[in-house]
């Protein structure tokens, strides 16, 4: 669609997914020759190389305003998770070889070889950081637990109750004269979306067929011409991508209005809504929020689709 997309995707490729190994060269073959996606790669164990290649990738994205893929070949240390017994499916030699590529050790090696630090200074810095981390862990472990429904719900409560209340009251007092021509529900929603796009320059509306076609029921017809292609645009037929874009736009200070075309497609994005959108405010203790308005068609022509 020609819309600038300055996006840098970073793949930390440790070559294994829990116990299943990635086919040799699969990442490079899959992403190395994609149209409109510039590919960069570096050895994740070599911090100097990572810095150089990362700078090149970032410069490309900023200069061309196009996406790039940064492939970092890394290692996985100490298994997939606390319950993962790595020696059950990997040999001791493989595990030991990974520790030889630990980027932390690689950084220490560079510091010593370039004369920036002595071995003793590196070890002292490491032990000092260990002390700091253990002290922080002790402090966190002693924090009060969430022991009541009120404590659990507090991070989810509206952070600006007064502003929300004032907006709700203003809407209830709005001029509701009905002496004009009757409109359909679709036309009323279209007007509301048009007013939102006009009054809020940070608002974006996107989804399947919402721009050029104007939605499968015509609800978004004409909005792309009003707000422009950068604010009202069609997406891939992928609900996870639609909601993922909305989540990212929300925390960037924008007002995303993603559309799920039919209710039957909602389950494709259930994890983004339940596992990300609905919990971000809780897990960040209200430091981050997801101010998105998810639109799903209702009163559709076919039972089960809206």
Show the residue positions of the predicted features.
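A generic structural-conservation signal
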Residues: 9, 41, 120-121, 149-150, ...
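Flexible loop/turn segments at secondary-structure boundaries
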Residues: 16-19, 48-49, 76-80, 147-148, ...
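Glycine-rich ThDP/TPP pyrophosphate-binding loop and its adjacent helix/strand module
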Residues: 1-135, 142
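A broad detector of short, well-ordered amphipathic alpha-helices
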Residues: 52-55, 138, 218, 244
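Short coil/loop linkers at secondary-structure junctions
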Residues: 117-118, 146, 230
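Thiamine diphosphate
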Residues: 2, 25-26, 153-306
